[in-house]
Each structure stands twice: as C-alpha cells, then as structure tokens.
Amino acid sequence: MRNCKMARVASVLGLVMLSVALLILSLISYVSLKKENIFTTPKYASPGAPRMYMFHAGFRSQFALKFLDPSFVPITNSLTQELQEKPSKWKFNRTAFLHQRQEILQHVDVIKNFSLTKNSVRIGQLMHYDYSSHKYVFSISNNFRSLLPDVSPIMNKHYNICAVVGNSGILTGSQCGQEIDKSDFVFRCNFAPTEAFQRDVGRKTNLTTFNPSILEKYYNNLLTIQDRNNFFLSLKKLDGAILWIPAFFFHTSATVTRTLVDFFVEHRGQLKVQLAWPGNIMQHVNRYWKNKHLSPKRLSTGILMYTLASAICEEIHLYGFWPFGFDPNTREDLPYHYYDKKGTKFTTKWQESHQLPAEFQLLYRMHGEGLTKLTLSHCA
C-alpha cells in the first residue's frame, strides 16, 4: 500500500514539474510577442501559431538556446513577406542620408582620420591605443613612417553606389555576388576570402580591413617561409585595393604590427596593395553612434565601414549584416561567417565586446527610413 502511495505521489510530482516547465516556455513565447521586437508587429496565419512559431523559429538560433532572450529572436511571417517585397519597394532617401552624413562629419573627419600620413606623424612619436590603458604606447619607427601614404587614400574620392559587405552566414547561398560586383566601390571586412564564394559575395574588393590578429590566426605570425608565401599570395589578389590596418585599437597588436611592418618593407614595390593605417579614430566614431544610443565596448567592423563609406559614397548598400544563427528566408541554421567550414556551430563569442543585435536593430531602422539598403533576402 505504502509503495503504491509513493508511486502515485512521484507521478503527480512529475506531472507538476512537466506542467511548470511547459508554462515557463509558454510565458517566454508569450512575452516575446508582447515585447517590442526588432522588426514589426507579427501577424500569424492561424490561432495558436504565435507560440509554436516562436519555438520553431526562435529556438533554432544558438543565440536563443544560450541566452533565452526572445526579444531578438522571433522571425515572423510578416517579416518573411517584408523581405520578399522590400527589395523592389525600398527607396533611397537622399535628403535623410545627406543629413546623416553631415552629422557624422561633425564628429569624425573621415578623410583626415582614414589613415595616418607621412606628414601627420614624426619618427619617435608615441601612439596610444583606442581600447587599451593610456600607459601602453607604440613608437613610430622610420620603417613604419615610410609605409604611410603621402595623403589620405580617399582624398577627393567620390563614388555613386558602394557596397559594404559583412561576413554573416546569411550570404551563404544568397547569389548576391553579381549585384555586389556592380557597385562602384566595395568595402569588405577582416580580409575575408572571396575566391571560393564569388557566387554569393562577389570578387570585387576596393578596400578590406585587416585586424593584426589575422596574422596570428591564419598566417602563423609569418614564422615560416610557407606562411610568408601564403600571406604574399593573399595580398597579391587584392591588386590595388586598400588594406586598412587598425593597428592602434589594442596594445596586444604591437608585436604583430612590427611583424607586418617588417614584411611590407621587405616586399616594398612587389605588391600593388595600398596601405592605410588609421590612428585613434574610434573616439570620434564612438561619439557619433553613442548619440544614436549605440555604445558597446566595441563597434563592429561593419558599422565602422559604414561610417567611413558615408563620407565618399552617395548611396550605401549593406550585405552580410545578420547576427543570428538562422536564415530569415529559409529558417535553416546558419554559420556565423559565410566562409566557416560546413558544420561549424554559430558562435556567440562576439557578445563579450559587441552589441550586434542592437546594431542590427539600428541598421534595420535606417533601412526603413531609406538611409541605406540592407539586403537580407537572396539576390537571385
């Protein structure tokens, strides 16, 4: 008798725990629908769909699995419809864009701060770092100064339509390559590869950023002849493009920067790449975006490139800006980068420094206002 009672109690407790778990999950989905999200007010085809839609769409994201923050996750039927219609409906608001450009230029002299020049620094001058303690310094050497341009590489440059290409996995299968290559000027981020992905990301590169840490991660700090050859061949493919090297963000880049300087001096005249070495630009850029209620530890490279593009481009189109682990068009899982190996899980390491969902929310709003065209759907 006693065993039967205990079994019944255990059964009841199990049902209670299951009910509580289901209630919590239901509340999560319900609250997410009530909260103002980053897109639009959702519309669903049938009663009861919102809750299940949240589970199937939201929980596909590794971001959601880890943080259970539904405000960033729901991909609704209305957004799917919007993605299909917006490319043809989007209209450039030139007046609003020019106003934004003026606002940016009030905070950032983009042309001047785009790169240090031979005339802007002297040998022995101590440079500080944007994101490191003021005690850390980098001394300008003769070799470093010799690599600086005589004038800003974007002085007196103007382009009609520019593409700023992020590295999000949303570009996988997008077939946006031809559209990107039709742009007058193409910005790329972090030396991202294009050769094996041309159908989706294009091949044209007019500028790519190069965080010094890339040398450690992909080229073994140039420690072997093979490493040096690989790096040389990668640079050769740029063929006249600007290599924008933010050497003064972190003091941890100092040693790698010196390795880079030695390499470029050694191969002087053998590469057509244009070198650009920005100084302490971020204090100015951060000030502008802070006024737009965006103040993470660090802005993403993508939004930094948008800032630079605003000074020389008459219209800016964005590709590969999507910080979530699922495709809004197909509901399929996505890698973090389009060039990640197949099966690579979506990473959330960026969360330590960046506010990518908040950046995306702002860019999406700018898209709606006609300031920039944000491509989230497939191009063909």
UniProtKB/Swiss-Prot annotation:
Q: Which GO terms describe its molecular function?
A: alpha-N-acetylneuraminate alpha-2,8-sialyltransferase activity; identical protein binding; sialic acid binding
Q: In which pathway does it act?
A: Protein modification; protein glycosylation
- Supply the alphabetized keyword list: Disulfide bond, Glycoprotein, Glycosyltransferase, Golgi apparatus, Membrane, Signal-anchor, Transferase, Transmembrane, Transmembrane helix
Q: Which cysteines are joined by disulfide bonds?
A: 162-313, 176-379
Highest taxon of the lineage: Eukaryota
Q: How does it assemble?
A: Homodimer.
Q: What is this protein called?
A: Alpha-N-acetylneuraminate alpha-2,8-sialyltransferase ST8SIA3
Species of provenance: Homo sapiens (Human)
Question: What is the organism lineage in this UniProt record?
Answer: Eukaryota, Metazoa, Chordata, Craniata, Vertebrata
